[in-house]
């Protein structure tokens, strides 16, 4: 199983453009990466695997329930709005209470970004799955409806059949995006290309599975 080298939680701020040394304008996504606090470590000896639990965006203690208050209290850190666990190669490289910032990554590094895609609501087969539409002529019995769902023999629709339904609002990973700029003072990462989600949504930036081989 592949284990990532490093990762951080962040917030998508929006898109902009960045000019390379050759004067080429490239689209970039600005991500507020951290600061993230290490709330818990998990090791193979105690939990069976290596991972770190990161907290992102502080929030008042009155907005945290009692179990989480105790969890943050045992770690000796302030409560966080978001709490996510990331699998790592070796949890011994981290300490509880350690703060991770944008300078965790370097310019030119290849990363994967995980986020929740924009919700589009209920959508038909053409928009949701890219189906071809039917004839638009006057005599046609269908235009944008899906065709046959199955053969007559099974007398049922198999699971996984592509049909109209809710589009978006799911976990999406975009792989092999290049970091073109790091601003450690403002905890900003400029990542080349688009990142899933709306402005202000939570994203996870982590070492690429394939790009750094």
Swiss-Prot record:
Pfam family, one: Ribosomal_L3
Assigned GO CC terms: cytosolic large ribosomal subunit
Cited Gene3D superfamilies: 3.30.160.810, Translation factors (2.40.30.10)
Keyword RNA-binding: yes
GO biological process: translation
UniProt keyword terms in alphabetical order: Ribonucleoprotein, Ribosomal protein, RNA-binding, rRNA-binding
Source superkingdom: Bacteria
SUPFAM superfamilies assigned: Translation proteins
Keyword check for Transmembrane: no
InterPro entries with a match to the protein in the record: Ribosomal_uL3, Ribosomal_uL3_bac/org-type, Ribosomal_uL3_CS, Transl_B-barrel_sf
A molecular function GO annotation: structural constituent of ribosome
Family: Belongs to the universal ribosomal protein uL3 family.
NCBIfam families linked: L3_bact
Subunit structure: Part of the 50S ribosomal subunit. Forms a cluster with proteins L14 and L19.
General function of this protein: One of the primary rRNA binding proteins, it binds directly near the 3'-end of the 23S rRNA, where it nucleates assembly of the 50S subunit.
Protein name, entry field: Large ribosomal subunit protein uL3
